Structures are given as structure tokens and as C-alpha cells.
A protein has these predicted regions:
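Flexible, acidic loop-helix segments that line cofactor/substrate-binding pockets
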Residues: 83-100, 214, 256-259, 266, ...
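N-terminal Rossmann-like NAD(P)+-binding subdomain of aldehyde/semialdehyde dehydrogenases
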Residues: 1-134
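ALDH superfamily catalytic-core signature
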Residues: 198-199, 224-225, 233-298
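Short coil/turn connectors at secondary-structure junctions
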Residues: 1, 143-149, 172-174, 202-204, ...
Length: 298
């Protein structure tokens, strides 16, 4: 099976044979992936002119209801994702965090609409009088940026990595271009196919790159946003790229971390705190083989 890319509102085959992707447990070939032939500049423009335009005219309430509808749609299809997730080397517990945790992010962000107005913008604070008699006032409003959120994600959360980020930019009124880690992108592609087939999102709200992103970051501008999850060395290299610096593109990096859990002296064996400590440490060193970015390592 050759994975496809979703760009410009349609599914597109990359050129060439592509990178082979294997079942982590059996070594069997699952799919091949390539993004060769994609015009990243055209994808960015499509996101800005079509996806951004469609999302920014929606109110926060409409965007929130959209997220909830999408979450319910994906939740009904979760068993299909579990079966594919096993091929990534994930256990049922690993997959639960990735799949249902990711869908849960859609629900959580959908609920935030209750704190926001039924408007496409948010008024910040109170109006401030700037002249005698109130003939000149100032009032800040928050509006969506006029660009695209580019998400470069890690291999160990092919569903969560996409949904936790996209939920935020969709609620804020921005479209996304998702670049999952190629090794497990076959699971991301299946979820994106269902999202596209649901017709819940407006045109241009989501695009997918299965394969190398090559020159994508060389074409983003100051209206775009980039998020990266992965190693610190790769993240720093991307964040320091000339175009990112020149255009002052917001770059959010979630990279290597070292997390610890501390047991108080009074939490002796037999106390609820000690039992909870053991339970949490066991979970953190076994889920995803202890390789979650938030895993307890000390």
C-alpha cells in the first residue's frame, strides 16, 4: 500500500517508490510513503486563502461544536485505529493514550467554547478612553492569524500528536498542515481519511504530508505558526533556519525532557502515597517503553 498525501483538497500520490514502512512486531511491509512532487508553497497558499478564510469567519461556538462533532465521529471508529496501531509496536494501553487521548483533546478544546463569545473574535479587557470626552478610545481584540499552523510530529503519538495540536488551531480559527513522523504515518493517514470523509471540517482546514517535508519551512511566513515535537537537536536546527528567523515565525518546540518523581520522607510503605508512587512509576517506565516525552526517568 502506498500512502497518499492530502493537499489542496484532494488525495495525491507522491512520485517515486517511497520509503518502506514496516510492522514493528513482525517486520512485514505495511506501506510506503513519499511526498515527492508536492508543491509546499501551493499547499501553504491554499491553507491561507481557503482554509483560513473558512475558519476565521466561524464563531468560537461554531468551531467548538465542530470539534465536538469530529470527536464523536472519530470515537465511533476507534477500534479500527487500535488494529492499525498494533503495527507501530504499541500495546493496547499505549494505543489508548494515543487514540482516545487524542480524541479527548478534541472534546476538551470543544468545551472551552463555553468561555468564549459567539463571535469570530475575542474582546480583551475593557475599552480605554484615550481622549477627553470619550471621542477617542482603544480596545484590543484577538483575531486569528492569517496563516497556517504547520505541525511536525513525533513517531510515538501518530494520533494524539495531530489532534492535540489541531484542536487548538481549529478553535482559534487557523488551518493546519500536519507532517507526522514518516515511520508511523500510516496510522495518521487512516485517521485523516476519516476526518476528510466526515465533511465536518471546512475546505482547507487540514492537509497531510506523508513523507519528507523538505523545503516546507523555507516557505512559511510571519502569519504562520510552526510546532515541533521530537529531539532537541533537530528542533533547534529547524528553529534556527534562516527563513524562520527572518520572518519571525512563532516556533513552539516540545523536545527532550528529564522528568522526575519525588517521594516525601513521610510517604512510607503502606501509605496511600507510597502505593500511588509505585503505581505511577511502573506506568511511566512501561507505557510506550518509557519513551513518552513526559515519562518519569528519575
Amino acid at each position: 500500500m502506498k500512502l497518499q498525501n492530502f493537499a489542496l483538497g484532494r488525495w495525491i500520490d507522491g512520485s517515486g517508490e517511497g520509503q518502506p514502512l514496516y510492522d514493528a512486531s513482525t517486520g512485514d511491509l505495511v506501506a510506503t510513503a513519499t511526498s515527492n512532487g508536492l508543491d509546499f508553497g501551493e499547499m501553504l497558499e491554499y491553507g491561507r486563502k481557503t482554509g483560513n478564510k473558512n475558519l476565521r469567519k466561524m464563531t468560537f461556538q461554531e468551531r467548538g461544536r465542530m470539534l465536538k462533532a469530529l470527536a464523536m465521529f472519530l470515537l465511533e471508529r476507534k477500534e479500527k485505529y487500535y488494529q492499525i496501531s498494533y503495527k507501530t509496536g504499541a500495546t493496547k494501553v499505549d494505543s489508548w493514550i494515543d487514540i482516545e487521548g487524542g480524541i479527548g483533546n478534541l472534546f476538551a478544546n470543544a468545551s472551552l467554547r463555553r468561555k468564549l463569545p459567539d463571535l469570530p473574535y475575542y474582546s480583551e479587557g475593557d475599552a480605554i478612553g484615550l481622549s477627553k470626552g470619550g471621542t477617542f478610545i482603544g480596545h484590543h481584540i484577538l483575531v486569528p492569524k492569517e496563516g497556517v499552523a504547520v505541525h511536525i510530529n513525533a513517531f510515538n503519538f501518530p494520533v494524539w500528536g495531530m489532534l492535540e495540536k489541531c484542536a487548538v488551531n481549529w478553535l482559534a480559527g487557523m488551518p493546519a498542515i500536519v507532517k507526522p513522523a514518516t515511520l508511523t504515518s500510516y496510522l495518521t493517514e487512516v485517521v485523516v481519511r476519516d476526518i476528510v470523509d466526515s465533511n465536518i471540517l471546512p475546505a482547507g482546514a487540514l492537509q497531510l504530508i506523508c513523507g519528507s517535508a523538505r523545503s516546507l519551512l523555507e516557505q512559511v511566513n510571519y502569519q504562520d505558526v510552526v510546532t515541533f515535537t521530537g529531539s532537541a537537536s533537530t528542533g533547534i536546527a529547524l528553529k534556527s533556519s534562516p527563513n524562520i528567523l527572518r520572518e519571525a515565525v512563532p516556533f513552539n518546540m516540545e523536545a527532550d525532557s528529564l522528568n522526575c518523581i519525588i517521594l516525601g520522607k513521610d510517604a512510607a510503605p503502606g501509605t496511600p502515597e507510597f502505593d500511588l508512587f509505585v503505581k505511577e512509576v511502573r506506568k511511566e517506565i512501561t507505557v510506550k517503553c518509557g519513551q513518552k516525552c513526559t515519562a518519569v526517568r528519575r
